[in-house]
């Protein structure tokens, strides 16, 4: 069972050179450098995940002036439904002692792609009707 759904920003990063191949990416955690988790979403069970719009904003100066870095929606996720990927993962047969366990965090993939960040600054992802999550990178 899913305990909660949270808004999040996944930071893509790799210890390996670009083009190292699928097995190397698997060994490197699928290029997951960090996960910035925001607030839990109330009443998430009734949401149409594929219809939720997401805007990623970047600000190099102050938080008040920003530009849109990327635009997407939950439809960009496998089969157009981010929660569907969680169900698919939960239904994959696994060896005893391996598989999903209570308390684990599952990311479903990017709704906005993986845009290159212009450098240090304030970044905010807005999830239509649900709220936002933000992160600040410093030099």
Residue ranges of model-derived segments:
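Charged, cofactor-coupling segments
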Residues: 115-139
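A conserved acidic, glycine/proline-rich C-terminal tail/linker
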Residues: 85-118
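A broadly tuned preference for mixed-charge, low-complexity surface segments
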Residues: 28-41, 105-124
